[in-house]
Swiss-Prot record:
Lineage: Bacteria, Pseudomonadati, Bdellovibrionota, Bdellovibrionia, Bdellovibrionales
Keyword set, alphabetical order: Ribonucleoprotein, Ribosomal protein
Protein name: Small ribosomal subunit protein bS21
GO molecular function list: structural constituent of ribosome
Ribonucleoprotein as UniProt keyword: yes
Listed GO CC annotations: ribonucleoprotein complex; ribosome
Keyword Ribonucleoprotein among UniProt keywords: yes
BP term (GO), one: translation
Organism listed in the record: Bdellovibrio bacteriovorus (strain ATCC 15356 / DSM 50701 / NCIMB 9529 / HD100)
Domain of life: Bacteria
The family this protein is said to belong to: Belongs to the bacterial ribosomal protein bS21 family.
Length: 66
C-alpha cells in the first residue's frame, strides 16, 4: 500500500503528487489494469513470447546500440 507522510504546512496538491508518484513506483495502477479482465495462461504466454520476439528483432536491427 502506498503511503505518504504529510509535513506541517504541506499543501494537498503536493501531497497528492507524492502519493501518485509512490503509486506509480509501486506499480499499483498497472497491476489493476492487468487484473481488470481475466487472461488465460495460454494467452499470457503467447503475449510474452511475441514481446520477446519484438525485443529480439529490435536488438538485431542494424545500427542499434553501435
Amino acid at each position: 500500500m502506498a503511503m505518504v507522510k504529510i509535513k506541517d504546512g504541506e499543501s494537498f496538491e503536493s501531497a497528492f503528487r507524492k502519493f501518485k508518484k509512490s503509486c506509480e513506483k509501486a506499480g499499483i495502477l498497472s497491476e489493476v489494469k492487468k487484473r481488470e479482465n481475466f487472461e488465460k495462461p495460454s494467452v499470457r504466454l503467447k503475449k510474452k513470447s511475441i514481446a520477446a520476439r519484438k525485443r529480439a528483432v529490435k536488438k538485431s536491427r542494424k545500427g542499434w546500440n553501435d
